[in-house]
């Protein structure tokens, strides 16, 4: 096709927009939302790189998916994992693939799996 230019936004379903706003803004540190349209069920955050993350109000009966995972770039995965733990987030110990990547998984308050990664030593 060749007409796609990149990722604009990745949308994550949540069941409570106020809790989602607090988690993504304060715990993950994305700052104030770019767009806060809670009345429409949508809040969008800048990630600090190309592509944004939005949280959208889920339909009744929604369950989190583990098949699709948002992976966020960080400068140092080990330090970022430790910081998330200090903020009360359950976070896996980082896994290192030497010469390739260090990554760790964690979950938002709604059960959505997220990961972070940094270059491996």
In which residue ranges do the predicted regions lie?
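N-terminal beta-strand motif that seeds the catalytic metal site of vicinal oxygen chelate
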Residues: 1-21, 68-70, 120-121
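Short catalytic micro-motifs in class I SAM-dependent methyltransferases
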Residues: 9, 28, 115
